[in-house]
Regions:
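AAA+/P-loop NTPase substrate/partner-engagement loops
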Residues: 93-122
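The catalytic "switch" region of P-loop NTPases
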Residues: 161-166, 174-256
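Walker A/P-loop nucleotide-binding motif
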Residues: 63-85
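Mid-core helix/loop region of P-loop NTP-binding domains shared across ATPases and GTPases
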Residues: 9-22, 117, 127-189, 252-253, ...
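Pre-Walker A adenine-sensing motif
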Residues: 48-64
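Dynamic helix-loop-helix/coil hinge segments at AAA+ ATPase domain boundaries and subdomain interfaces
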Residues: 27-47
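C-terminal alpha-helical "lid" subdomain
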Residues: 1-20, 24-33, 225-227, 234-344
Length: 344
């Protein structure tokens, strides 16, 4: 049997869906491809990423310049990955030319050992592995590839996954020494790091003074009401009117609704955007021209499977309902913190 392409498989999957689901899914695909700007996050990340390029532009001393570490932390669903990718893309555009080779992007697998992280870096530089390597060999090969490519920055996303492997203070220090030796090498241009993940990563960086003094920290703080009400309301209006081209029911921009939305998203900016995307796509899929509270309720029910009595968009005492996303955020926090508590 001949294999079909991913594009053809997707077309067949879409064709198998009911008309409303097909329209909704197609619209969500469009929304997922765009980046929704956020002034607060974007400015903080722009300043952080800029330190990498300012450092690289310095005149070398003794033939090299130290690399920087930009540590980006935020709870699950905060929108870290998209925001970092956007900040790096803007910096590349400002420099001009084809500079993709100057930026290595890799994802820490889950679970993750030090050796597996080295292989993730090798994957990020498109190095073809035919078999799994021992930890020391993997890091040595990663170092050789980084020396060859000379990237300005290596971005490791979801780095909290390494914490499950670091069960003691000694293991954490050994890992940080490995990173210093094989990634933050004395050379020009310097290799800098962008490390992103849950807030517990700050504790890991604090275990090494040489690492800590290089860190520029960017914290993507959770949303709160009423502090971020206007910020979230702008997103609601921008997504529904500009991105999807629909009208907005007055109730959907009220303070009471914005508070519901922030609560349901567990204060995570990225999740709040996802909820608005899903609701707008629901109305679009059903062929209606106005997004209402019911679209948010339907989208939440479809995504989570929760009954009406546990749907924050339906019940009067919504602030007493623990949203599904809050459980997911809390679980990620517990899993990341446990190894650090054991090591302490």
């Amino acid at each position: 049997m001949m294999a079909i392409s991913n594009a053809e498989l997707r077309e067949r999957l879409l064709f198998s869906l009911p008309e409303d689901a097909r329209r909704r899914t197609a619209k969500l695909a469009q929304l997922n491809d765009r980046y929704l700007p956020d002034k607060e996050h974007d400015q903080a990340l722009k300043a952080g990423i800029a330190t990498i390029f300012e450092q690289a532009a310095k005149k070398p001393t003794r033939g090299f310049v130290e690399g920087k570490i930009v540590l980006v932390t935020g709870e699950s669903g905060a929108g870290k990955s998209k925001a970092i990718r956007n900040a790096l893309a803007q910096q590349k555009a400002a420099m001009g030319g084809d500079l993709d080779h100057l930026f290595v992007e890799c994802l820490a697998p889950s679970p993750c050992t030090s050796g597996q992280l080295a292989m993730a870096v090798l994957d990020g530089v498109s190095y073809q592995l035919v078999r799994e390597l021992r930890e020391n060999v993997a890091w040595r090969r990663a170092r050789d590839q980084l020396k060859r490519i000379k990237p300005l920055a290596v971005w490791i996303d979801e780095l909290q996954h390494i914490l499950d492997h670091l069960q003691s203070e000694a293991e954490a220090v050994k890992f940080l020494n490995t990173v210093k030796t094989h990634v933050l090498m004395p050379q020009w241009p310097p290799v800098s790091l962008v490390l992103s993940g849950l807030p517990v990563l700050k504790q890991l960086a604090a275990k090494d003074r040489q690492i800590q003094r290089r860190v520029h920290e960017v914290i993507l703080h959770p949303l709160s009401f009423p502090k971020d009400a206007d910020r979230v309301r702008r997103n609601v209006v921008g997504i529904i009117k500009n991105d999807v081209g629909l009208k907005i029911d007055a109730a959907v921009v009220s303070d009471e609704f914005i508070a519901r939305l922030i609560h349901t998203a567990a204060g995570a900016l990225g999740l709040s955007i996802k909820l608005v995307d899903e609701a707008a796509a629901t109305a679009f899929g059903n062929g209606r021209d106005t997004v209402t509270l019911r679209d948010f309720a339907d989208a939440y029910a479809r995504e989570t499977g929760r009954p009406a009595s546990e749907n924050p968009f339906l019940v009067d005492n919504w602030h007493l309902v623990r949203p599904w996303y809050a459980d997911a955020v809390a679980l990620a926090k517990i899993q990341a913190a446990a190894p650090q508590e054991k090591a302490a």
